Amino acid sequence: IDLNFNNACNLRCKYCFTNSPKGDHVKEYLDYKAIARLADEADELGYFEFDLQGGELLLQPNKLFKVLEAIKPERFYMYLTTNGYYLDDAMAKRLAEAKVSRVSVSIDSMDEKIHDEIRGRKDSWRRAMEGLKHVQKHGMDPYLNITVGHYNAHTDHLKQLLDYSKDQKYK
């Protein structure tokens, strides 16, 4: 099950339609009871994976943890996708305690300057890379989420990302 419950984001990625915390696309959220019913039905039907996506989920941690509580992650291989900007050690610990199994962190390049330029925010690369380490430290599966586009498809960046992921024993 893939659940996109938040379209707000703190970055301005050149390729992403979800590039603003303002606008009609961020006003409505599924209520927690609907999410709980969806998770219960998924569990009854034998689904074993649940993926939370956004926007940036860690931008609104209180909502994220209410959603996790509604889902009851212990029933699933629970994972979420983040740009990693707010994925500090304390957040990684909270996610692990909430029974999140895997955290996918979006990285566009092993070159910090290129990644930050694509993402539209200085320090986004450094914080994302640190976030991956925090995920691993707290026993969750770190995962590189790589978006491929014209800006990196014909460069060494993809190979560098894959080699790094393998060297770090990321999924």
Regions found by a protein language model. Give the residues of each.
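Conserved alpha-helical substructure of the radical SAM core
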Residues: 1-102
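Conserved radical SAM core fold
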Residues: 57-59, 84-89, 104-122, 148-152
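Generic structural signal for individual residues within well-ordered alpha-helical segments
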Residues: 36, 65, 93, 116, ...
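Glycine-centered loop/turn positions within well-structured domains
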Residues: 11, 112-113, 142
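Short intrinsically disordered, low-complexity coil segments enriched in acidic
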Residues: 1-5, 27-30, 116, 163, ...
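Conserved C-terminal portion of the radical SAM core fold
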Residues: 45-53, 74-79, 101-104, 126-171
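Alpha-helix N-cap and loop-to-helix initiation/capping positions
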Residues: 26-30, 119-124, 153-156
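Glycine-rich, phosphate-binding/catalytic loops in enzymes
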Residues: 68-70, 96-98, 120-124, 160-163
